[in-house]
Amino acid sequence: VTLALLYRGIMWLMGHSEKLEDLLEGKPIVVVEEGQLAWEKLHAENMTEFEFFMELRVNSVEQLGQVRLAILETNGQISVFYYPDEEVRAGLSILPAHCTTRYTTIPQEGIYACVRCSIVMAMQAGEKRICPRCANAEWSKASRAKRLT
């Protein structure tokens, strides 16, 4: 009985105090916005890109340009909101590393994505570029794959 009353009291307080609710339950965190990974937010939540990409693959995501918004919910699940096919943009492939090639020197002109933070940039053959967002030097060819449902 005491536990039930304590639980009801806490739930009532949380219903009347947003700060207390945030303290006890946490806040949902936007981890992908407009196809761009917020890797610093993932790391703050002690989640690696590998774990996150696995969760996205389970949700039929092949590349980040398919994702308009992804939210790490307070219960650990990931909510994914997709672009319609006609709005899908080039993005970082989230297939496992052995399925994609990484470059420090760009082999041919095209659109490439930083393998760490997912920023997408046009690059020329022979170019060696440090990512302006995260200072990483590795790039992969950006994917334009649409979702298959």
Describe each PLM feature range.
Residues A122-K128, S140-A145:
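Short Cys/His-rich "knuckle" micro-motifs
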Residues V1-E25:
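Transmembrane alpha-helices and immediately adjacent membrane-cytoplasm interface residues
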Residues D22-L42:
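Membrane-cytosol interface motif
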Residues F53-E109, A145-K146:
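A broadly conserved sequence feature marking short terminus-proximal activation segments
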Residues E49-E51:
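ATP-binding catalytic core of ATPases
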Residues A113-C117, I130-C134:
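Short cysteine-rich clusters marking metal-coordination/redox-active sites
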Residues W12, E18-K19, H43-E45, S60:
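Transmembrane helical hairpin unit
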Residues Q108-Y112, G126:
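Flanking scaffold residues of small Cys/His-coordinated metal-binding clusters
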